[in-house]
Design a protein with these regions (language model features):
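Claisen-condensing/thiolase-fold acyl-transfer catalytic domains that form or cleave C-C bonds
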Residues: 47, 51-54, 58, 77-78, ...
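Acidic-glycine-rich active-site phosphate/pyrophosphate-binding loop
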Residues: 21-30, 80-94, 131-137, 193-201, ...
Length: 320
């Protein structure tokens, strides 16, 4: 197992968001904990971030890209409607022997991706597979919309999984869930077959939308539930978990989940203060940083928990 992450170099602090009033800018940190976020430059696209994170991941253990057998890319902000953004990642990495495809479960994408990778390895479809989560919300947000624009950032994370017979490391268990009756709570309304470009009432239909209060309530409800379900199904206690890596949506959600589960908040990895909400990339970026900082070492158990559009939510138990 190896990890990598990449954040674009453009740092946007709350005070730089001059389109909002000083009073509104003060509320950003109070409501969410976000102090800064990273934005890509005009010439960068989602696959560029994915490629950079993937290269870091592979170079860390000197793994040749041509030995990859599969690439799964989680993104809800793809380069184009089609083809899969993963195809450009495969080409630029030189992973000529790897199949490549995208998945889109919005902020839950990494949990769903981990479960897919686990199934592919267990079915012996492949022995080495790269999961990448890459998001560039800065280009799908309305910069004047205070309900979304200040809270998101761009970034990518990657993790390489390899089949190892007899090993106790890797993906131990996954739990996934969806409530499609609320699929409109987090969405980009226009651009698909439901609302084609030529029928869009205006450019605002192409922007990301979110009903924040409903998302907060959903996360506080289903986040703890999916973590408890994961622990119950595996027989692992919360005391045995070294770190909880939850989707980096809001510091109040993270602290709320910790309180509801009776887990010290120090066990929760937090980077949203620096990067904002990087959607499906958030947990893989946080995992990479936790490993690089020595908070997770070989043999440690970690829980990854995500919640987002669809509505969807998931959790994974991994051993480093």
């Amino acid at each position: 197992m190896s990890t990598g992450s990449f954040l674009p170099g453009k740092v946007i602090a709350n005070e730089n968001l001059s389109q909002f009033s000083p009073e509104a800018r003060k509320l950003i940190a109070e409501k969410t904990g976000v102090q800064t976020r990273r934005h890509a430059v005009e010439t960068e696209c989602t696959s560029d971030l994915a490629i950079a994170a993937a290269r870091k991941c592979l170079q860390k253990i000197e793994f040749p890209p041509e030995n990859l057998q599969g690439i799964v890319l989680s993104t809800s902000s793809p380069d184009r409607l089609l083809p899969a953004t993963a195809t450009r990642v495969q080409h630029e990495l030189g992973a000529r022997s790897a199949f490549a495809f995208d998945i889109n479960s919005v902020c839950s994408g990494s949990s769903f991706g981990i479960a897919v990778v686990d199934a592919l390895i267990r079915s012996e479809t492949c022995k080495s597979i790269l999961l990448v989560a890459s998001e560039m919300y800065s280009k799908i947000l309305n910069r004047k919309d205070f309900t979304t624009y200040p809270f998101f950032g761009d970034g990518a994370g990657a993790i390489l999984f390899q089949a190892e017979s007899g090993s106790s490391r890797g993906i131990l268990h996954s739990c996934l869930a969806t409530d499609g009756s609320r699929n409109d709570i987090i969405c980009v309304p226009g651009g698909g077959t439901m609302l084609p470009f030529e029928k869009m009432p205006g450019p605002r239909s192409a922007y990301f939308r979110m009903r924040g209060e409903e998302v907060f309530a959903f996360s506080m409800d289903r986040g703890p539930q999916i973590i408890l379900r994961l622990l119950e199904e595996t027989g692992v206690t919360k005391e045995e978990i070294k770190c909880f890596i939850c989707h980096q949506a809001n510091i109040n959600i993270l602290h709320g989940i910790a309180g509801l589960l009776g887990i010290p908040k120090e066990k929760f990895i937090v980077n949203l203060d620096r990067y904002g909400n990087t959607a499906s990339a958030s947990v893989l970026i946080a995992l990479d940083e936790a490993i690089n900082e020595g908070r997770l070492v070989q043999g440690d158990l970690a829980v990854i928990a995500t919640f987002g559009g669809g509505l969807s939510w998931g959790a994974n138990l991994i051993r480093l």
